[in-house]
Amino acid sequence: MRIDTSELCDIYLDQVDVVDPIFSSFGGVQAFYGKVTTVKCFETNGLIEEILEENGEGRVLVIDGGGSIRRALIDAELARLAADNHWEGIIVYGAIRQLSELENIEIGIHALAPIPVSADESNYGESDIPVNFGGVTFFPEDYIYADLTGIILSQEPLDLDELNAE
């Protein structure tokens, strides 16, 4: 299914929230969408790993890392785990690492920046709660659409047949 956030905004602007353009794409998949699953943690990724061990089919993990770019919340090992468990993508309000490996893993990843320092592996944090960054609030069960142009959020699934009929 083709995703184009620009065209989705043309069709559904009154139904979507547009995330501030603060993210870059780092994964092997450039466009992805799915139902939001949230996690909030600061410079730790143990809880992220627990969540990525779940079946992620049709889901996108939205990580509120407090905007910290001092430690990477996602690395190649976690990205492979996510891909193996069929996650559609990961949005990280924080840092990631091991870019040369991430670009070869079949998952969409958007993050603020890379840094070589790993996160602490403790599992402090909260999951399935509303998180706020990039000018929007992400609620569990919202729908997220991402590509190289940007990230948009909707409370209801968007009809992608509108794009793919062209």
Curated annotation (Swiss-Prot):
Location, primary (coarse class):
cytoplasm
- Protein's cellular compartments: Cytoplasm
- Is-annotated flag, keyword Ubl conjugation? no
Q: What keywords were assigned to this record? A: Cytoplasm
Self-association and partners = Homotrimer. Binds to both RNA-binding sites in the C-terminal region of Rne and to RhlB.
Q: What does this protein do?
A: Globally modulates RNA abundance by binding to RNase E (Rne) and regulating its endonucleolytic activity. Can modulate Rne action in a substrate-dependent manner by altering the composition of the degradosome. Modulates RNA-binding and helicase activities of the degradosome.
Family recorded in the similarity comment: Belongs to the RraA family.
What PANTHER family does this protein's entry cite? Answer: 4-HYDROXY-4-METHYL-2-OXOGLUTARATE ALDOLASE 3-RELATED, REGULATOR OF RIBONUCLEASE ACTIVITY A
Quote the HAMAP family the UniProt record gives: RraA
Record protein name field: Regulator of ribonuclease activity A
Q: Which organism is it from?
A: Actinobacillus succinogenes (strain ATCC 55618 / DSM 22257 / CCUG 43843 / 130Z)
Upper classification of the source organism reads: Bacteria, Pseudomonadati, Pseudomonadota, Gammaproteobacteria, Pasteurellales
